[in-house]
Amino acid sequence: MGELKEILKQRYHELLDWNVKAPHVPLSQRLKHFTWSWFACTMATGGVGLIIGSFPFRFYGLNTIGKIVYILQIFLFSLFGSCMLFRFIKYPSTIKDSWNHHLEKLFIATCLLSISTFIDMLAIYAYPDTGEWMVWVIRILYYIYVAVSFIYCVMAFFTIFNNHVYTIETASPAWILPIFPPMICGVIAGAVNSTQPAHQLKNMVIFGILFQGLGFWVYLLLFAVNVLRFFTVGLAKPQDRPGMFMFVGPPAFSGLALINIARGAMGSRPYIFVGANSSEYLGFVSTFMAIFIWGLAAWCYCLAMVSFLAGFFTRAPLKFACGWFAFIFPNVGFVNCTIEIGKMIDSKAFQMFGHIIGVILCIQWILLMYLMVRAFLVNDLCYPGKDEDAHPPPKPNTGVLNPTFPPEKAPASLEKVDTHVTSTGGESDPPSSEHESV
């Protein structure tokens, strides 16, 4: 009990104590370090709005709460956008730096994902109280989002592959971020299908399925790399483990998109992709596939939660970072997919489970918002040396695995491996005991 008390005391000083303020730095200088990761907050806020809009067990006023969250998201997005604009105008070099930085460029995806939730909530909260013009607004925003997210995805991965060479040791769940925005196109198509006429919905559904599949397959590739990292290197530092919830999002959102898109196809008149007698089969297949991949999302959710809690109750340092909003957004897909599966198979248990997890996420969001405000006010965020832009680039993977790099830049461990490979490709004497761990 004594050790547990000491750990909790340490966590209090790291996460809740207000008497740990760093030296004062003018706000204009702090905004130089206002990185893209701040949009993870608006991404999560939009996700909470989506959860509130999908709760199966509702009470009077819940829709009003959802609209308040929607307005809050718009306010925060405008505020963060203004801060980012100030940063780029005051410090023009940060425009290029933010794109070329090995970590910060990944978080540009959180800005796009915030916009995706904005479009989703237009259909939930704005469309019922507006006119025909909202149908056009949603459709135009959707196609703009599709184009921008795909361009970002391609260019982000190209820059990563071209400028940064990673090792298994540096594998991170954040690698999945660039594929998230195009993947969410399927979720948006499913969310807005009730607002669009059939002849327009068909094209939106095609793009949605296409990009949802793209996102899911790329996710599987990157997920495998991260699992290999866990096997060979172990889990990340406790402070970085909330990022593991990123693995929950793609399978959960894919299941959600399949069900919602199928429901839109079945309910449209005239029918799209289905006939009068085949709608029920489309619903069955989509639900079947959603359940098939839901298990992966549930496993990733449990693994991430256990890993974080195990790290929380250690003496390893634990400081809040904007990346902690990964607790929320990926799990939004898990909650909504669970609820929709429950509706399709008429299971109150599934719906109740999704509802409970959704309530927990709303509570987590409130706590994370508090931690974010506290971290900013005590100079733990948006402060020189404490944000993503201060992270050093990964060491290049060289030697045997990548002989195109100059030998003098090879990490020491790989240089040792390389000394035991002959010029003809054959192996020389086995390494000595001091190198056996390499």
UniProtKB/Swiss-Prot annotation:
- Keyword check for Secreted: no
Output a single Gene Ontology CC term carried by this record: plasma membrane
A single GO molecular function, which one? malonate(1-) transmembrane transporter activity
Topology term for the membrane: Multi-pass membrane protein
Subcellular locations according to the entry: Membrane
One Pfam match, by short name?
A: SLAC1
Gene Ontology terms: biological process:
malate import across plasma membrane; malonic acid import across plasma membrane; succinate import across plasma membrane
Name the residues that span the membrane.
37-57, 65-85, 106-126, 140-160, 172-192, 205-225, 242-262, 288-308, 321-341, 353-373
Keywords on record: Membrane, Phosphoprotein, Transmembrane, Transmembrane helix, Transport
Report which superkingdom the organism of origin falls in.
Answer: Eukaryota
Instruction: Outline the segment boundaries, as ranges, of region: Disordered.
Output: 390-438
Keyword Isomerase among record annotations: no
- Residues that the record marks as modified (Phosphoserine) are 413, 423, 428, 432-433, 437
Q: Which PANTHER family match?
A: MALIC ACID TRANSPORT PROTEIN (PTHR31162:SF0), MALIC ACID TRANSPORT PROTEIN-RELATED (PTHR31162)
Task: Tell me, in a sentence or two, what this protein's role is.
Answer: Permease for malate and other C4 dicarboxylic acids.
Q: Family, per the entry? A: Belongs to the tellurite-resistance/dicarboxylate transporter (TDT) family.
Q: What is this protein called?
A: Malic acid transport protein
Q: Which gene encodes it?
A: mae1
